[in-house]
């Protein structure tokens, strides 16, 4: 699921523009001059309107703090073009890193390509000589897997709808504990074994403990944004590696196709579970749990920047380390550092509102299934690099098209259908057409 974070308030555009600037960027001219007093503000406004009438031009700063609701023509498009491309790139980087971690592990660590077990959600084996029976078993495994995903998603939405925040947090914390401690222990042990690196158990356990403890703090409490993003990428890669190892080959491809269809239905249907989850969060003005969503931008507020009270006109609270960064409390409510504005003369009762920085949110499930597709392409069959790179490029193309549609429709969209469809088409076409062609050229020593 792919969503776009944007400010809903149009009463004070000054906050939206300054929240996207650096901490040391100067305040716009209209903001500084318009707060001097009622007489100065009126004189400034009259002088500016006369100047604009004489020049025949429109001052864009007049819309910043003039109290006029709405934006000047073209400002919304300018902000979308300026900051939209940046966040697209910021989303490409983590997706690429997650897939690189998975492919590098598949190519180097044999543990994740050895088939010595299956998930309990895929009980039907594919070790049968009959193609029809193998296809039937893969379809049955897919039906069971998708049913489990649907039931758990609906269960999560019901819990969220009835505000069972503590239960959801406990559920997510237990999942994170298993990923950050158990799966990390297995992963690190296999990597050390592959590269023949000796390490005693106390050191290994201490390393896993430090890694997991820091991850739990960053994901479920507060920490640097970059560190939180790195942990979300890592747990997505670990989960993808588990699916690659324990999902049967044919079942994995059928599940990828089915999950993209389910994602389409769950997000776009009026009563789809993911759509209901997003709409409920928007109605309550609450963030979706950070353990489920990767965000290219956190909820940065004006209180986090190094403001100059003399130039900004703001009264900040004394420094408190616990309020340095925005975080989420134990009930999922946003917790912001407070910045108080003194009442502006000439604007009774008007206060600057904290705005959310524009950004793109991508569900961790999308990271996982992107990596499963690329990892399966690297692990199954010939494991040809051409096939792996083709799937990688297909996923990025699909993600780019999804982001383009997101900019057009400006609502939550499923991120799996286009990318997974392109990935499956590129995989089977490359594996069955391009790879034999390249092998034939290589056998005849012909190079293009």
From Swiss-Prot:
Name the residue ranges with Polar residues bias: 19-30
Where the record places motif PAL is 414-416
Which GO molecular function terms does the record list?
A: aspartic endopeptidase activity, intramembrane cleaving
Q: Which InterPro entries match?
A: Pept_A22A_PS2, Peptidase_A22A, Preselin/SPP, Presenilin_C
Per UniProt, what does mutating residue 263 to A do? Reduces production of amyloid-beta in APP processing
- According to its UniProt record, what is one Pfam family this protein matches? Presenilin
As stated in the Swiss-Prot or TrEMBL entry, residues carrying the post-translational modification Phosphoserine are 22, 25, 30
Q: Which UniProt keywords apply?
A: Alzheimer disease, Amyloidosis, Cardiomyopathy, Disease variant, Endoplasmic reticulum, Golgi apparatus, Hydrolase, Membrane, Neurodegeneration, Notch signaling pathway, Phosphoprotein, Protease, Transmembrane, Transmembrane helix
Q: Which residues lie on this side of the membrane: Cytoplasmic?
A: 1-87, 160-166, 222-223, 271-361, 410-413, 435-448
Which Gene Ontology BP annotations are present?
Answer: amyloid precursor protein catabolic process; amyloid-beta formation; calcium ion homeostasis; intracellular signal transduction; membrane protein ectodomain proteolysis; mitochondrion-endoplasmic reticulum membrane tethering; Notch receptor processing; Notch signaling pathway
Result, substituting residue 126 to K:
In AD4; uncertain significance
Which residue intervals are topologically Lumenal? 109-138, 188-200, 245-249, 383-388
Q: How is it modified after translation?
A: Heterogeneous proteolytic processing generates N-terminal and C-terminal fragments. Phosphorylated on serine residues.
Segments carrying the region annotation (Disordered) are 1-70
Name the intramembrane ranges. 414-434
Q: What is one GO cellular-component annotation here?
A: endoplasmic reticulum
Give the location in the cell: Endoplasmic reticulum membrane; Golgi apparatus membrane
Q: Which residues form the active site?
A: 263, 366
In short, the EC number is 3.4.23.-
Explain what the record says happens when changing residue 148 to I.
In AD4; late-onset Alzheimer disease
Physiological role = Probable catalytic subunit of the gamma-secretase complex, an endoprotease complex that catalyzes the intramembrane cleavage of integral membrane proteins such as Notch receptors and APP (amyloid-beta precursor protein). Requires the other members of the gamma-secretase complex to have a protease activity. May play a role in intracellular signaling and gene expression or in linking chromatin to the nuclear membrane. May function in the cytoplasmic partitioning of proteins.
Question: What binding partners and quaternary form does the record give?
Answer: Interacts with DOCK3. Homodimer. Component of the gamma-secretase complex, a complex composed of a presenilin homodimer (PSEN1 or PSEN2), nicastrin (NCSTN), APH1 (APH1A or APH1B) and PEN2. Such minimal complex is sufficient for secretase activity, although other components may exist. Interacts with HERPUD1, FLNA, FLNB and PARL.
Disorder noted: Alzheimer disease 4: A familial early-onset form of Alzheimer disease. Alzheimer disease is a neurodegenerative disorder characterized by progressive dementia, loss of cognitive abilities, and deposition of fibrillar amyloid proteins as intraneuronal neurofibrillary tangles, extracellular amyloid plaques and vascular amyloid deposits. The major constituents of these plaques are neurotoxic amyloid-beta protein 40 and amyloid-beta protein 42, that are produced by the proteolysis of the transmembrane APP protein.
Describe the family membership recorded for this protein in Swiss-Prot or TrEMBL: Belongs to the peptidase A22A family.
Q: In its UniProt entry, what is this protein called? A: Presenilin-2
């Amino acid at each position: 699921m792919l969503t776009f974070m944007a400010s809903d308030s149009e009463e004070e555009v000054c906050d939206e523009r300054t929240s996207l600037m650096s901490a040391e960027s100067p305040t716009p001219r209209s903001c500084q001059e318009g707060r001097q007093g009622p007489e100065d503000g009126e004189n400034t406004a009259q002088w500016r309107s006369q100047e604009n009438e004489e020049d025949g031009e429109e001052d864009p700063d007049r819309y910043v703090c003039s109290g006029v609701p709405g934006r000047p023509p073209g400002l919304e498009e300018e902000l979308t073009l300026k900051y939209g491309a940046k966040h697209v790139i910021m989303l490409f980087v983590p997706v690429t890193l997650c897939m690189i971690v998975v492919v590098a592990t598949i190519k180097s660590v044999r543990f994740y390509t050895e088939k010595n077990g299956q998930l309990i959600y895929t009980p039907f084996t594919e070790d049968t000589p009959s193609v029809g029976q193998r296809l039937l078993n893969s379809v049955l495994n897919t039906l069971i897997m998708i049913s489990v995903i649907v039931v758990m998603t609906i269960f999560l939405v019901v819990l969220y709808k009835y505000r069972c925040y503590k239960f959801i947090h406990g559920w997510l914390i237990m999942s994170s504990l298993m990923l950050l401690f158990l799966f990390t222990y297995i992963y690190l042990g296999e990597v050390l074994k592959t590269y023949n690196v000796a390490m005693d158990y106390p050191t290994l356990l201490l390393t896993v403990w430090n890694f997991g403890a820091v991850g739990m703090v960053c994901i479920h409490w507060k920490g640097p944004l970059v560190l939180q993003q790195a942990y979300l990428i890592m747990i997505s890669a670990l989960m993808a590696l588990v699916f690659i190892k324990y999902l049967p080959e044919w079942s994995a491809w059928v599940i990828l196709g089915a999950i993209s269809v389910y994602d389409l239905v769950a997000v776009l249907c009026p009563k789809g579970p993911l759509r209901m989850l997003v709409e409920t969060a928007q109605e309550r003005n609450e963030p979706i749990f950070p353990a489920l969503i990767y965000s290219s931008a956190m909820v940065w507020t004006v209180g986090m920047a190094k403001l100059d009270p003399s130039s900004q006109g703001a009264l900040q609270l004394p420094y408190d380390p616990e309020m340095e960064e925005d975080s989420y409390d134990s009930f999922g409510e946003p917790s912001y550092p407070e910045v108080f504005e003194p009442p502006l003369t000439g604007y009774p009762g008007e206060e600057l509102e904290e705005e959310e920085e524009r950004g793109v949110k991508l569900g961790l499930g999308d990271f996982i299934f992107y990596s499963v597709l690329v990892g399966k392409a690297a692990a199954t069959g010939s494991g040809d690099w051409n096939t792996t790179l083709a799937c990688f490029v297909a996923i990025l193309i699909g993600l780019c098209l999804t982001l383009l549609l997101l900019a057009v429709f400006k609502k939550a969209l499923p991120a799996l259908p286009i990318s997974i469809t392109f990935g499956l088409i590129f995989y089977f076409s490359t594996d069955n057409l391009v790879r034999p062609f390249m092998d034939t050229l290589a056998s005849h020593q012909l190079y293009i």
